[in-house]
A protein has these predicted regions:
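Flexible "arm" and connector segments at domain edges
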Residues: 1-83, 87-114
């Protein structure tokens, strides 16, 4: 029986992929046309931050749609997808600023007194 990956595994794996793409970008190893992540890094801070704003707005709209639809499973699934998009783009921003999700987790733990 295989162990199902947990939240920490998924976060670390995705952050590793984003960081690897950033390294590829910095070394000029990947054509931005073949990698969405590299394309974001190529466009720079403003484009990455703008994308986070767009994804945050889409998440808010999906949450409102879910609430107005009495938490309909399809609307809930849309909300989950939008949160995933937002988190993904936040991981890109963290990498852009030489940070990792673990830095955010450490801050959350500090706030929780852990």
């Amino acid at each position: 029986m295989s162990k199902e990956p947990g939240l920490q595994d998924a976060i670390a794996k995705l952050a590793d992929v984003v960081d690897a793409r950033r390294a590829d970008f910095e070394a000029g190893r990947v054509d931005p046309e073949t990698s969405y992540i590299v394309r974001l890094f190529t466009k720079g801070d403003d484009a990455i931050l703008k994308k986070i704003g767009e994804e945050a707005a889409e998440m808010v709209m999906a949450a409102k749609d879910s609430r107005y639809a009495n938490l309909d499973p399809e609307k809930q699934a849309k909300l989950v997808g939008e949160v995933a998009d937002l988190w993904f783009h936040c991981f890109v921003a963290l990498s852009q600023f030489n940070l990792r999700p673990e830095d955010v987790i450490a801050e959350l733990n500090r706030r929780a007194g852990i």
